[in-house]
Amino acid sequence: MASSTSGIFFQGDDESQSFINSHLTSSYGNSSNSAPGCGGPTGGYHNLSMVSGDMHNPVMMSVSTPGPSAGASSLVTDANSGLSGGGPHLQRSASINNESYMRLPASPMSFSSNNISISGSSVVDGSTVVQRHDPSVQLGGSSATSLPTSQTNQIPLSMARRASESFFQDPNNLTQARKKPRLDSKQDDALQQQILRQWLQRQDILQQQQQQQQQGQNPQFQILLQQQKLRQQQQYLQSLPPLQRVQLQQQQQVQQQQQLQQQHQQQQQQLQQQGMQMQLTGGPRPYENSVCARRLMQYLYHQRQRPSESSIVYWRKFVTEYFSPRAKKRWCLSHYDNVGHSALGVSPQAATDEWQCDLCGSKSGRGFEATFDVLPRLNEIKFASGVLDELLYLGVPSERRYGSGIMVLEYGKAVQESVYEHIRVVREGHLRIIFSQELKILSWEFCTRRHEELLPRRLVAPQVNQLLQVAEKCQSTIDQSGSDGIHQQDLQANSNMVMAAGRQLAKSLESHSLNDLGFSKRYVRCLQISEVVSSMKDMIDFCRDQKVGPIEALKSYPYRMKAGKPQMQEMEQLAAARGLPPDRNSLNKLMALRNSGINIPMNNMSGQGSLPGSAQAAAFALTNYQSMLMKQNHLNSDLNNTTIQQEPSRNRSASPSYQGTSPLLPGFVHSPSISGVSSHLSPQRQMPSSSYNGSTQQYHQQPPSCSSGNQTLEQQMIHQIWQQMANSNGGSGQQQQSLSGQNMMNCNTNMGRNRTDYVPAAAETPSTSNRFRGIKGLDQSQNLEGIISNTSLNFGNNGVFSNEVDESMGGYSWKS
């Protein structure tokens, strides 16, 4: 071994040692006196390295350019392994001591051409080399010492040249150099691990540099380079011991996982930035994935691949799959100039006046609409009334996506073709479909410009030929007999033949039972029924809320709507000023309270003091309260002077909370069910207030027992309705009521709930008018339920009541 500043020599037999020593002594003289302050050959051969890539061609190279020394930072693993390059590229680490020596492993590591190439760069850093301090190393009888680092560059370069020339020119030296030198040293596992770590680090650095340099190069070259690197890594792993191989593979896996995590984080950041930009802009933008167009293709495919006998069950599943529960399907016929309202006959004049197409902006009133509940029955009727297939020819799509997730698919030109057995109906227009985030249809709008009815030639040709033959026969008869010689019988026969041929032609044209719009009569009838029922929904709600029959509702509903329209507008304005949604049901409840004579403070209304509960509970309590007031009015007018003795047994069977008080209503006695109801009440509710007891004992001298709290209850009802409107907007408020307010509320609620539990006393025989008035409210509610059930049975075949009507849908938004 040589010192850290000397060249690299190999210790062989005596001849090779004497050969090297002779050249060293001839070039520099005495090793101790060859240079001032210099230790002999270690100072001059700092740029000398031996390369033995092949044993048959040993070469000693000398680099002519001065540079840093290649000492302990250079690695020679075997006499057969080569280091190409020289001094300018091999840099010495400053951390290596001048007297440090490098120990080489006993088992060499071979780097083939396919494995790794070391050219012009140091493989092992000097800081990681295990140093061994040895005062001197004997090399062929001449001592070799090390020079200080500051004096290594003072050796003249000509000496190295002469030494190399003398070495190559001597033929004896070549034969001696063919002998294989050997290096004997001990195994050092720590050094191998350090070498592996440094090699991996250098490989990562080189890989990053190459990737940065090759970003703009050919991708095929990059693929080939990656494949070559993989092969080199595999070969290198195979050459390693099993333990080191496992460790290296684990390190590579950890690095790959870290890279994947970094890429995933970068992708998430990009998506978040895009989402923030979409939320900031909020406007439509092109959506290149065409996901809505593909969804429409799926819709058409499943519609065409329907079962041969498609029932209502299949169409309900179909509509549920592709349509949102709040979906609507609209057809606009505003561009039909020769078609009036009578052609469709769907909506009343009030409804058609409010019709407006969102695509063309027309307010002609010609068009119709179907909601989610009607679509299953509508599809069944359409394909059961003669439609064999329905085709849709689409132009260039325009697909947009908004920041809220709503996607709009629009076709400026769309052709819909309905295929019947003997006719084809072709409609051309503008189609726009709005999809939700779940890719379900929210709105289907088709603005039709015109339509054509196409008949096959084979259907019309026989009748036309027959008519032509009859006309030719008539003409021949006239030619033969003249205009004056035609007999009356022949003229009548020819006329009958012409009429028969004309009727046959007209029959072939009108056998499909289509109207002027190209729709089947049964299809239009279903639309009519659904539209009528939808328009009557408000009146049905009015019947249910007011507990009146249909005939009385028909009499009073138009006047109520006409008189209540300004009040409804006032309610809507007040709700908008309070920041509440325009809930029709809640506004109708408030209108009912106001029409019944209850004073609603419109200016000082606040959400505080409202009772918790759902909108259904508020509507139920309000309905019970109204029914109770109506029933009390009838009973007060008819039974004010009637006295009924109460049975002691019934008094004893009553609830303890009501003992010692007079009956709630004259002419009626307690039912045993009162005790059952009161037993389920809370203790707080079972405590009657003093005002309640005082009022019930003096019924004949003053209004009913709970009349003193009617005003408080009215205010509570109003507050409750306002609070339910606020809760539907996302807010909630629960305020505690006072004890007197709760007792008053319980009093009225119990009266309303248990009004059917009171039975007339046996001593009283009510007259016809009393019986009618006493059970008027119950009869009206029963009649209303019967009428609604009969209506559903009558319209059941047409599929109007196939699904439950969702009150939250709000009906048609284009209606007033």
Curated annotation (Swiss-Prot):
InterPro entries: LIM-bd/SEUSS. GO terms for cellular component: nucleus. Residues 139-153, 166-176, 644-662, 672-711 have a biased composition (Polar residues). Residues 307-554 are annotated as: Dimerization. The gene is SLK2. Residues 133-153, 166-189, 644-711 are annotated as: Disordered. A motif (Nuclear localization signal) lies at residues 316-330. Probable transcription regulator that functions in the development of the carpel margin meristem similarly to SEUSS (SEU). In association with SEU, supports organ development from meristematic regions by facilitating auxin response and thus organ initiation, and by sustaining meristematic potential through the maintenance of PHABULOSA expression. DNA-binding adapter subunit of the SEU-SLK2 transcriptional corepressor of abiotic stress (e.g. salt and osmotic stress) response genes. The keyword Protein biosynthesis does not apply. Forms corepressor complexes with LUH; LUH is the transcription repressor subunit and SLK2 the specific DNA-binding adapters. This is Probable transcriptional regulator SLK2. Disruption phenotype: No visible phenotype under normal growth conditions, but the double mutants seu and slk2 show severe embryonic and seedling defects characterized by a loss of all structures derived from the shoot apical meristem (SAM). Enhanced tolerance to salt and osmotic stress conditions. Keywords: Developmental protein, Differentiation, Flowering, Nucleus, Transcription, Transcription regulation. Belongs to the adn1/SEU family. One of its GO terms (biological process) is negative regulation of response to salt stress. It comes from Arabidopsis thaliana. Expressed in young flower meristems, ovules and the carpel margin meristem. The lineage of its organism: Eukaryota, Viridiplantae, Streptophyta, Embryophyta, Tracheophyta. It is found in: Nucleus. It comes from the Eukaryota.
